[in-house]
């Protein structure tokens, strides 16, 4: 056997979508490295390219297909190149049908990531494509290897799937029903992260408030937070996402009492009109949401509240849209992720009449963003002169001569300082505020 053949194969993972996919890609990397692969510096030297995909919006799918076209032309020059395709798009039958003509060697789903090394070996042995996607979720497989990038912050899954079936959302169909990880497994992972030098963790779930249901033991999300708060070495804890319909007082009390829990709650409103909320199957009203905001600010003074907002949902009138703008005024979100409604085949909303023209959706999005950005700027300006505790993350991407850091309320703060501060919690005085970031200077009492 020649020297060339002895070299380990190299892989590259292309990740699209949410934090759940980022975490899945870390697991995929761990599985591949456990099978003898090494990570490639770039696509040109990879023997295996893995797509970990998102199907929440058409734009995400279009990016994937565009990149897949690029890789297919690369494969014509290098026929031995293997392409694996996973993530939420792989769960959709119509996508799998398209992939049969795209030069893909392995297709795997969200429920059988752990099988990837075996599927790759099968494809190489058969010299023909292997499509293996589980339609139904199985039991959670623990433990799985992981290959996280060195750093300060880490994502930790606490549950998988979703039972809410919002009418616009494909996630319950691609991620399956809710399954919670055992609390002991989660705490063990947090302890391992602390031992590896991570300072901050973000607990992930489609709806973290549902954590514990179906576990067979009496535990809810607040109980898990109290346990996580006691893990030595972890200095900050975040979580996402919270469904507004079931944020309990006990959860809010846990945020108030646990010193490591950051004062930031992402509670997606999605729309401000009760009629549209009902069509979305969100199971709460604008009045419920406003009371929730009152409760959040009562239990956690100064809490940062962020949201997702969708414009152009089928049947949304100008009056419905104005109600969303009104909620933005009333709540005054610290930040909001805003989206055009994206019609997803297989969801109930896709079958609704009165689909809104694209140009009208874009105009509404522009109006919404304009006002939300003004509010975010105003809130940030109120922080000028304040002292904020920040976790120093590293050199700023926009100005490597400065450091970037993050407040407990999840705001970016740029300041001047030495690299010895990276990884530390320090106090910074805010000197300037913009829409998406703050600027400051080290504060020494």
From Swiss-Prot:
<dbReference type="GO" id="GO:0051539">
    <property type="term" value="F:4 iron, 4 sulfur cluster binding"/>
</dbReference>
<keyword id="KW-0408">Iron</keyword>
<dbReference type="GO" id="GO:0046872">
    <property type="term" value="F:metal ion binding"/>
</dbReference>
<feature type="binding site">
    <location>
        <position position="88"/>
    </location>
    <ligand>
        <name>[4Fe-4S] cluster 1</name>
    </ligand>
</feature>
<dbReference type="InterPro" id="IPR005839">
    <property type="entry name" value="Methylthiotransferase"/>
</dbReference>
<dbReference type="InterPro" id="IPR013848">
    <property type="entry name" value="Methylthiotransferase_N"/>
</dbReference>
<dbReference type="InterPro" id="IPR007197">
    <property type="entry name" value="rSAM"/>
</dbReference>
<feature type="binding site">
    <location>
        <position position="18"/>
    </location>
    <ligand>
        <name>[4Fe-4S] cluster 1</name>
    </ligand>
</feature>
<dbReference type="InterPro" id="IPR020612">
    <property type="entry name" value="Methylthiotransferase_CS"/>
</dbReference>
<keyword id="KW-0963">Cytoplasm</keyword>
<dbReference type="InterPro" id="IPR006638">
    <property type="entry name" value="Elp3/MiaA/NifB-like_rSAM"/>
</dbReference>
<dbReference type="Pfam" id="PF00919">
    <property type="entry name" value="UPF0004"/>
</dbReference>
<keyword id="KW-0004">4Fe-4S</keyword>
<feature type="domain" description="MTTase N-terminal">
    <location>
        <begin position="9"/>
        <end position="125"/>
    </location>
</feature>
<feature type="binding site">
    <location>
        <position position="54"/>
    </location>
    <ligand>
        <name>[4Fe-4S] cluster 1</name>
    </ligand>
</feature>
<dbReference type="GO" id="GO:0005829">
    <property type="term" value="C:cytosol"/>
</dbReference>
<feature type="binding site">
    <location>
        <position position="166"/>
    </location>
    <ligand>
        <name>[4Fe-4S] cluster 2</name>
    </ligand>
</feature>
<comment type="subunit">
    <text>Monomer.</text>
</comment>
<keyword id="KW-0479">Metal-binding</keyword>
<dbReference type="InterPro" id="IPR006463">
    <property type="entry name" value="MiaB_methiolase"/>
</dbReference>
<dbReference type="Pfam" id="PF01938">
    <property type="entry name" value="TRAM"/>
</dbReference>
<dbReference type="InterPro" id="IPR002792">
    <property type="entry name" value="TRAM_dom"/>
</dbReference>
<protein>
    <recommendedName>
        <fullName>tRNA-2-methylthio-N(6)-dimethylallyladenosine synthase</fullName>
        <ecNumber>2.8.4.3</ecNumber>
    </recommendedName>
</protein>
<dbReference type="Pfam" id="PF04055">
    <property type="entry name" value="Radical_SAM"/>
</dbReference>
<dbReference type="InterPro" id="IPR023404">
    <property type="entry name" value="rSAM_horseshoe"/>
</dbReference>
<feature type="binding site">
    <location>
        <position position="169"/>
    </location>
    <ligand>
        <name>[4Fe-4S] cluster 2</name>
    </ligand>
</feature>
<comment type="similarity">
    <text>Belongs to the methylthiotransferase family. MiaB subfamily.</text>
</comment>
<keyword id="KW-0819">tRNA processing</keyword>
<keyword id="KW-0949">S-adenosyl-L-methionine</keyword>
<dbReference type="GO" id="GO:0035597">
    <property type="term" value="F:N6-isopentenyladenosine methylthiotransferase activity"/>
</dbReference>
<feature type="domain" description="TRAM">
    <location>
        <begin position="381"/>
        <end position="444"/>
    </location>
</feature>
<feature type="binding site">
    <location>
        <position position="162"/>
    </location>
    <ligand>
        <name>[4Fe-4S] cluster 2</name>
    </ligand>
</feature>
<dbReference type="InterPro" id="IPR038135">
    <property type="entry name" value="Methylthiotransferase_N_sf"/>
</dbReference>
<keyword id="KW-0808">Transferase</keyword>
<comment type="function">
    <text>Catalyzes the methylthiolation of N6-(dimethylallyl)adenosine (i(6)A), leading to the formation of 2-methylthio-N6-(dimethylallyl)adenosine (ms(2)i(6)A) at position 37 in tRNAs that read codons beginning with uridine.</text>
</comment>
<feature type="domain" description="Radical SAM core">
    <location>
        <begin position="148"/>
        <end position="378"/>
    </location>
</feature>
<keyword id="KW-0411">Iron-sulfur</keyword>
């Amino acid at each position: 056997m020649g020297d060339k053949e002895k070299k380990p194969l190299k892989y590259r993972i292309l990740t699209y979508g949410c934090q759940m996919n980022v975490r899945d890609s870390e697991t995929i990397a761990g599985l591949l490295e456990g099978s003898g692969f090494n990570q490639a510096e770039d696509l040109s030297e990879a023997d295996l390219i893995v797509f970990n995909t998102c199907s929440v919006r058409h734009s995400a799918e279009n990016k994937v297909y565009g990149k897949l076209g690029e890789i297919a032309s690369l494969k014509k020059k290098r026929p031995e190149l293997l392409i694996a395709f996973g993530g939420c798009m792989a769960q959709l039958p119509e996508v799998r049908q398209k992939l049969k003509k795209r030069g893909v060697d392995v297709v795997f789903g969200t429920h059988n990531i752990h099988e990837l090394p075996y599927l790759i070996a099968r494809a190489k042995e058969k010299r023909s494509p292997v499509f293996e996607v589980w339609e139904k979720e199985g039991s959670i497989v623990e433990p799985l290897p992981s290959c996280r990038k060195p750093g300060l912050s880490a994502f930790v899954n606490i549950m998988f799937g979703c039972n809410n079936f919002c009418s616009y959302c494909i996630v319950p169909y691609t991620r399956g029903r809710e399954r919670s990880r055992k609390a002991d497994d989660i705490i063990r992972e947090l302890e391992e992260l602390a031992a590896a030098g991570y300072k901050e963790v973000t607990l992930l779930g489609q709806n973290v408030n549902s954590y514990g249901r179906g576990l067979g033991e009496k535990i809810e999300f607040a109980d898990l937070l109290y346990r996580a708060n006691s893990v030595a070495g972890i200095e900050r804890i975040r979580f996402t996402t919270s469904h507004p319909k079931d944020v309990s007082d006990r959860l809010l009390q846990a945020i108030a009492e646990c010193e490591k829990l950051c004062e930031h709650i992402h509670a997606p409103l999605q729309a401000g009109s009760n009629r549209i909320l009902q069509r979305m199957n969100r199971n709460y009203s604008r009045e419920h949401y406003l009371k929730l905001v009152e409760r959040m600010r009562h239990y956690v003074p100064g809490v940062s509240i962020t949201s997702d907002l969708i414009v152009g949902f089928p049947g949304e009138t100008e009056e419905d849209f104005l109600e969303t703008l009104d909620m933005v005024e009333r709540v005054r979100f610290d930040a909001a992720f805003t989206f055009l409604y994206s019609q997803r085949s297989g969801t109930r909303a896709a079958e609704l009449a009165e689909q809104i023209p694209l140009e009208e959706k874009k105009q509404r999005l522009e109006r919404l963003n304009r006002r939300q950005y003004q509010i975010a700027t105003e809130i940030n300006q109120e922080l000028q002169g304040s002292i904020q505790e920040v976790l120093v993350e590293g050199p700023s991407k926009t100005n490597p001569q400065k450091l970037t850091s993050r407040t407990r309320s999840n705001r970016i703060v740029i300041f001047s300082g030495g690299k010895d501060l990276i990884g530390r919690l320090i106090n910074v005085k805010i000197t300037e505020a913009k829409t998406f970031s703050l600027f400051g200077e080290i504060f020494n009492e």
